[in-house]
């Protein structure tokens, strides 16, 4: 009886263990250095005070799906969304975004950001700072929101 039970339970446990291992390995891990909420602190001649007053942010906390992260962006008026792909070697590609369509008094920051974000081709994460740049020397600098 005990031998028969072992013959039945051993393969059953092996299958369950294999399923557990395969399931755990398919979960994509987040990159804690990149996938966080970022506050915009330097961009296109806008003062840091303007950026802070607008609560300018880019949220990269969504899960990676096939290497891509859905970025949620706010620049003081509308909510925007872009698909971003951060690649090895400091390369990034950012899709044309979508946005809500509210009309606000001062949309200069939002309009400028929306035009420039798609042109960013490089990135670097140094400490608590994320910098995006294009091939013409334009940059966007962010600081991690959870950094004191």
Protein language model features and the residues they cover:
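Lipid interaction determinants
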Residues: 2, 10, 22-148
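Sec-dependent N-terminal signal peptides
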Residues: 8-18
């Amino acid at each position: 009886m005990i031998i028969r039970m072992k013959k039945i339970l051993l393969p059953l446990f092996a299958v369950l263990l294999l399923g557990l291992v395969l399931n755990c390995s398919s979960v994509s891990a987040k990159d804690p250095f990149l996938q966080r909420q970022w506050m915009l602190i330097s961009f296109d001649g806008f003062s840091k005070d303007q950026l802070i007053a607008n609560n300018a942010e880019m949220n990269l906390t969504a899960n990676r799906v096939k290497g891509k992260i859905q970025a949620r962006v706010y620049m003081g008026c509308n909510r925007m969304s872009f698909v971003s792909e951060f690649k090895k070697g400091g390369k990034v590609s950012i899709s044309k975004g979508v946005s809500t369509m509210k009309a606000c008094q001062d949309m200069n920051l939002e309009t400028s950001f929306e035009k420039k974000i798609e042109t960013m081709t490089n990135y670097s994460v140094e400490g608590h700072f994320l910098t995006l740049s294009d091939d013409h020397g334009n940059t966007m600098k962010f600081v991690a929101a959870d950094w004191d």
